[in-house]
């Protein structure tokens, strides 16, 4: 028995990651899929990614490390999600799964249409499936109710579910009525070497030492708390004459930010960068002293980890899974309310002043003499100022922050934990169709019957496609050798 288990654990798996959210788009899901795939390849597995086309980027592309990506042409709807069609994608997914000898289909993000459709088609083909949820959703609004019902349908017949935080796990278990035993909490991570703090003595702006710079990198949408940001910036700028904001990202709330900047004449203190690429993130972060996150709901928030790794102090709303992400000494929490965000950001600004001047007592005098701040008044303890003195508290220095984050988060560890889930799923016996239909039927009095109809039609299509296009006649894609790739790459950069 032991030898059988050991041989199963050492198997090389063929994994297909499916999501609507992938590079060249940037975000937490995109970063997770890319980095996790790279580390799984290094662990000896075969990984391909399937996503929809981005502009003129379609067809098959190879990324670094031999990661193969299928950019499938598909009509899009709001938020970069593909148009739901249920069955029209079956043939192309089937061809990809057969060509790549896929054993496990791993879908990412509840908002991804490709993810739901790929899992449905994979189960009809008898493949093992895993789902990773990257978001938190409510239970009261119409969109949440509909998506939760769809999620329950998809997850009724999934081998295992991964959530990026324990809060997200509880949320997903409730939304989809799942057995907690088949749900695991595996967080995101970062490549710490890509988010090094600014070297000591390095000057990016000639007047940078005069300013306390607050960085905001986010999609400019309601869910990310942009309304709170719009009302908080003028109050902070009124109180602190040496504070400026750098905001990166795009979204419908950019108009509100531009109007706020015009109304309060803050053009020289609020910089809007627009859409940024992944390669620009570190360069923007090291320009700042504080990273501000105003999200109304968040399962993990990879942005605050990247900011802490670059040595920034973090101010964040205390929502969702954020309290699980970083130690308390690295960030200042605030309620998702205007007054609380202003108060928390104000306290952190004074800490930065103390860190920059290394004169905590002088900053404390500034606090007591400041009369311009409107309500609420800052509540700053002696401990706040003691913590801000980087001379006496090395664990609060930027490089110390980086080292702590580096020790906490590693994609290699995440890949190992994900691999453990795969080996668990691959050993689950395949249930008969009638058992799958029983699971779908339990999704609701009306919805259950509809889901059963969808599953039966999908199964019949699978049978029809096998008659028309037998799997034996589909050409298998040649294997990509990571060893040869590394050898050729080495000879290219270091010719003999």
Regions of interest found by a model, annotated:
Residues 256-276:
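Nucleotide-activated donor-binding/catalytic signature segment of Leloir-type glycosyltransferases, i.e.
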Residues 313-316:
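Short hydrophobic beta-strand element within catalytic cores of glycosyltransferases
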Residues 202-237, 246, 407:
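Conserved donor-binding/catalytic core segment of Leloir-type glycosyltransferases
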């Amino acid at each position: 028995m032991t030898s059988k288990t050991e041989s199963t654990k050492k198997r090389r798996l063929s994994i297909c990651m499916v999501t609507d959210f992938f590079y060249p788009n940037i975000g937490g899901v995109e970063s997770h899929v890319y980095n996790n795939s790279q580390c799984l390849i290094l662990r000896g597995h075969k990984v391909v990614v399937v996503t929809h086309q981005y502009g003129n980027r379609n067809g098959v592309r190879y990324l670094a490390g031999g990661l193969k990506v299928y950019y499938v042409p598909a009509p899009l709807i709001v938020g970069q999600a593909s148009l739901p069609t249920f069955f029209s994608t079956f043939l192309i997914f089937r061809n990809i799964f057969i060509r790549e000898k896929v054993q496990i289909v791993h879908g990412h993000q509840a908002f991804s249409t490709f993810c739901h459709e790929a899992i449905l088609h994979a189960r009809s083909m008898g493949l093992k499936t895993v789902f990773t949820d990257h978001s938190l959703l409510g239970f009261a609004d119409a969109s949440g109710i509909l998506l939760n019902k769809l999620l329950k349908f998809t997850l009724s017949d999934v081998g295992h579910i991964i959530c990026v935080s324990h809060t997200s796990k509880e949320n997903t278990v409730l939304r989809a009525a799942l057995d907690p035993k088949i749900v695991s909490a595996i967080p995101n991570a970062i490549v710490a070497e890509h988010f090094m703090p600014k070297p000591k003595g390095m000057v990016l702006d000639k007047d940078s030492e005069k300013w306390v710079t607050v960085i905001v990198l986010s999609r400019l949408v309601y869910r990310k708390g942009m309304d709170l940001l719009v009302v908080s910036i003028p109050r902070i700028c009124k109180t602190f004459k040496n504070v400026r904001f750098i905001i990166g990202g795009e979204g419908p709330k950019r108009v509100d930010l531009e109007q706020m900047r015009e109304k309060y004449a803050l053009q020289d203190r609020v910089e809007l960068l627009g859409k940024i690429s992944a390669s620009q993130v570190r360069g923007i972060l090291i320009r700042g002293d504080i990273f501000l996150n105003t999200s109304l709901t968040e399962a993990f928030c990879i942005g605050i980890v990247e900011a802490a790794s670059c040595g920034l102090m973090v101010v964040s709303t205390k929502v969702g899974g954020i309290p699980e992400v970083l130690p308390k000494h690295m960030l200042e929490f605030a309620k998702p309310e205007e007054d609380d965000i202003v108060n928390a950001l104000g306290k952190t600004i004074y800490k930065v002043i103390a860190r920059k001047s290394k004169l905590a007592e002088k900053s404390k005098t500034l606090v007591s003499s400041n009369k311009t701040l409107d309500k609420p008044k800052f509540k700053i303890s002696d401990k706040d100022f003691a913590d801000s003195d980087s001379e006496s508290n090395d664990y609060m220095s930027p490089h110390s922050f980086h080292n702590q984050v580096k020790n906490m988060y590693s994609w290699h560890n995440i890949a190992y934990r994900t691999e453990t889930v795969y080996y668990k799923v691959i050993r689950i016996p395949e249930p008969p169709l009638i058992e799958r239909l029983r699971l779908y039927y339990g999704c609701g009095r009306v919805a259950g019957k509809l889901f059963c109809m969808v599953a039966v039609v999908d199964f019949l299509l699978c049978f029809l496609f096998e008659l028309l296009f037998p799997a034996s006649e589909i050409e298998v894609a040649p294997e990509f050798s990571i060893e040869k790739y590394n050898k050729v790459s080495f000879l290219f950069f270091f010719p003999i």
